[in-house]
């Protein structure tokens, strides 16, 4: 297979902090095959974000998600298509944890439903399961094998006749240019007492901190692994951190019911005393999980 051509942005744009709107960041690190991209650190909310970044337009989106569309185009219907065995237990554990906060269990929406693994785990516990994705092929696979409706739409424009008691977003928020708008949209789609579950990478994890220190001491050329490929794009528009996520949720009227870091082997971070210390006490794992509910007026 021929290598993908190098990605060259049509234009660049400087942006304020996507979480708080502040425009007074400090340099955090440079990355990319030629260190052509820049992460800055917001002094106000502590979000790490890309600026200047390639202009967020159709050209960037097509390049950023080319590999996902390529995967979707090659998916074939079959008994083993839907889920990878390694990920089924993880999502089942996550769903079992989330339903503790969702007494109603009426309808669930998975934003960025992909291969449908989360919906596969959640469907038996909910009256209705709905997916939202950008790939028609992937949506067709999930609909055919799970019998759930997968909508092809932007989340900002998505409408549904029924409110949801759970909205799930796993590792999609960091790809979104306006995360505040997404959280407000989620609140409008949630039933009274409904919950939002958000999973994101943790830029301030212990591992990330150590590698960033090595970068600052010039012991490592750049933080990201795999950035030697010039075709790669900075598809993460920002890298969430614990303080910035707390800020974002509070700013948009959410009450945090539970939050912790996690590993794929233990999504609820409760299996061992060490896991509880690292992920629920210190919260320094490589991923962050939040369960939140819109605050009631009055």
Regions found by a protein language model. Give the residues of each.
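Conserved N-terminal segment of class I S-adenosyl-L-methionine
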Residues: 1-170, 179-183, 242, 259-278, ...
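Acceptor-substrate binding/catalytic loop of class I
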Residues: 33-36, 228-242
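Short catalytic micro-motifs in class I SAM-dependent methyltransferases
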Residues: 170-175, 199
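A short glycine-rich, Lys/Arg-flanked "PGG" loop and its adjoining helix->strand segment in the class I
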Residues: 180-195
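Conserved class I S-adenosyl-L-methionine
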Residues: 198-220
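Short active-site alpha-helical segment characteristic of glycosyltransferases
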Residues: 245
